[in-house]
């Protein structure tokens, strides 16, 4: 955890450039895409409730991969790995849990509180920010959680179908959050970046 959280001072120029481009990408999405995506989702699911199954049961279930389903998946890998003496499966489960704690539990939570962005369902616009005021839309915690797990799986199991499946499921978590009015597109993009970076960093550090 300490290694990942203290990584920025060790970044080289290329890594800082990449981070700058990522930040610009999030700002660009916020300015250009957030409103059209929100309007489209409202037309598709105007009365959608994120807490109960609705007309789109599929997205309701996919959203849970940003919380309990992915934890169950990691638990399954750990148990199966321990029973079958599969060190990679055990390491993947451990790295996945560590990445969730760092990406979703620490970085995302702290950023949410500091930024204080209102959610789409609050209907106050895309640029309503109250730092430390209670609003917590940016970034998406479900998405950072899901992408942290996807990144860990993809970095442990280097098969194309595994990578595609992992990131596809994580992406659908983001779609579900937008569908349910929980997040703007830029919230989801930022969460995906955080989760992916943290997952990759945790795996690389523990393999080194």
Predicted regions and their residues:
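N-terminal targeting leaders of membrane proteins
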Residues: 1-66, 70-84, 113-114, 120-136, ...
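Interfacial segments of alpha-helical transmembrane regions
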Residues: 15, 19-20, 82-107
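Hydrophobic alpha-helical transmembrane segments of multipass integral membrane proteins
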Residues: 24, 71-75, 106, 146-149, ...
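Alpha-helical transmembrane segments of multipass membrane proteins
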Residues: 25-26, 30, 34, 103-108, ...
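Extracellular loop and loop/strand-boundary signature of outer-membrane beta-barrel proteins
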Residues: 60, 87-90, 94-96, 134-136, ...
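Alpha-helical transmembrane segments of integral membrane proteins
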Residues: 61, 68, 72, 95-96, ...
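Small-polar-interrupted transmembrane alpha-helices in polytopic inner-membrane proteins
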Residues: 76, 97-114, 165-177
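Membrane-embedded catalytic cores of phosphoryl/pyrophosphoryl-handling enzymes
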Residues: 120-208
